[in-house]
């Protein structure tokens, strides 16, 4: 039998902007659009877009969700000023429509069946492709972009961040309720989003060329349109020249958003310097990365994770303290060490999920939980 020689598939390079200033920062938050009295979700994104300055608010999949995002910022001070101003302005826009905004990983008592899909081709195509999986994606996340000045370095940083996704999730978990009931999860957002394809802890890439070839293979196969259809917890973002961290629930208190962003920025700096020094990353089984993520989603800071270098079970809180202490020097270099005080507060007073549960346990009233979320979102 003769085999037919085949030409290798041609792969077009993925255009990128990994060439600017390192450690620039961008923060994105997905927020709820609410009735100001009942705190129920309202399908009002078009009203908000009409009333807000162009570009200040962006739509998401559902009409009851909006996104705000900072510009690429030189440092945490600039990012904090922008994010605070954005929350204030969006809240004022909402108030003018007898609406309010709130920030958490899920709405405690909303039903996805009541939400309308935004009339944009990308979202209609997403519903057509994913059906129920996309229709029930009524969740709210926070994304942090950190600038990287070299494409191979971006891959190294993204690979190195994978092991830390569970700790970041434990710190940020802020969604213990879903469809008017406690779920027993610290981050209910996580299993809801897990139903999507191309999600969760990503694969490890050898270098930028390996990433390019694998992305282009999927595009040529017709399964994705471009790399933005990979919704992994951490990913290179070639268009922006950043590494993007996507694992975290939206934070109710803006100080926690900024503290977590400062922590991420410091972690990226550590890994970028690791690359510059020619050091290699330790390799751990993907199954254990994924297991740790599940444990963080289930228990938040109250459980244990597997410390992968030692294979020992260690409290999530202890691992988070260890990470935080190691990042202080990097955050100091970046002018962001004061923002880490908010991460300390998460560790000492509890994350958003724990705080929601405390409010709920007083009267078992989820509207009280939402009232607390709305008030704290604007504090």
Place the predicted regions along the sequence by residue.
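C-terminal accessory/tail domains of diverse enzymes
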Residues: 1-97, 126, 193-379
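Short, flexible active-site-proximal loops enriched in glycine and acidic residues
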Residues: 58-61, 94-107, 132-139
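Short, glycine/charge-rich beta-strand/loop segments that flank catalytic centers
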Residues: 98-115, 178-183
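Short, low-order "capping/linker" segments at domain edges
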Residues: 112-124, 183-199
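Acidic, His- and aromatic-enriched active-site or binding-groove loops in soluble protein domains
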Residues: 120-140, 204
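Helical (often loop-to-helix) elements that flank the catalytic cores of nucleotide-handling enzymes
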Residues: 120-127, 148-169, 252-268
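Coil-to-beta-strand transition motifs
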Residues: 137-139, 152, 238-242
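An acidic/histidine-cluster motif and surrounding catalytic segment
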Residues: 144
């Amino acid at each position: 039998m003769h085999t037919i020689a085949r030409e290798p598939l041609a792969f077009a390079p993925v255009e990128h902007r990994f060439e600017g200033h390192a450690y620039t920062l961008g923060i994105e938050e997905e927020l709820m659009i609410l009735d100001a009295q009942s705190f129920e979700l309202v399908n009002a994104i078009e009203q908000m877009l009409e009333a807000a300055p162009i570009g200040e608010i962006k739509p998401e999949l559902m009409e009851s969700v909006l996104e705000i995002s900072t510009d690429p910022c030189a440092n945490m001070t600039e990012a904090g000023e922008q994010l605070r101003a954005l929350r204030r302005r969006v809240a004022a826009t909402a108030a003018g429509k007898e609406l309010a905004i709130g920030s958490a990983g899920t709405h405690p008592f909303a039903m996805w069946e009541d939400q309308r899909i935004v009339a944009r081709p990308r979202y209609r195509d997403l519903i057509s492709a994913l059906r129920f999986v996309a229709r029930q994606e009524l969740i709210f996340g926070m994304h942090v972009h950190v600038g990287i000045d070299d494409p191979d370095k971006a891959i190294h940083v993204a690979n190195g961040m994978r092991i830390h996704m569970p700790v970041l999730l434990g710190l940020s978990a802020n969604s213990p309720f879903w469809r008017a009931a406690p779920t027993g999860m610290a981050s209910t957002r996580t299993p809801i989003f897990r139903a999507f394809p191309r999600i969760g802890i990503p694969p490890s890439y050898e270098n930028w060329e390996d990433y390019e070839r694998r992305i282009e293979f999927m595009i040529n196969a017709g399964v994705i349109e471009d790399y933005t259809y990979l919704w992994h917890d951490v990913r290179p973002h070639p268009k922006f020249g950043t590494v993007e961290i996507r694992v975290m629930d939206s934070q109710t208190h803006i100080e926690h958003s900024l503290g977590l962003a400062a922590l991420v920025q410091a972690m990226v700096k550590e890994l970028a310097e690791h690359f510059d020094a020619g050091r290699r990353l330790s390799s751990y089984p993907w199954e254990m990365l994924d297991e740790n993520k599940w444990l963080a989603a289930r228990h938040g800071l109250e459980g244990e994770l597997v410390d992968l270098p030692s294979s020992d079970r260690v409290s999530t809180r202890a691992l988070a303290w260890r990470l935080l202490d190691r990042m202080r020097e990097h955050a100091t270099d970046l002018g962001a060490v004061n923002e880490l005080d908010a991460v300390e507060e998460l560790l000492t007073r509890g994350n958003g999920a724990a705080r929601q549960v405390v409010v709920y346990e007083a009267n078992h009233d989820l509207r009280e939980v939402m009232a607390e979320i709305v008030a704290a979102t604007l504090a």
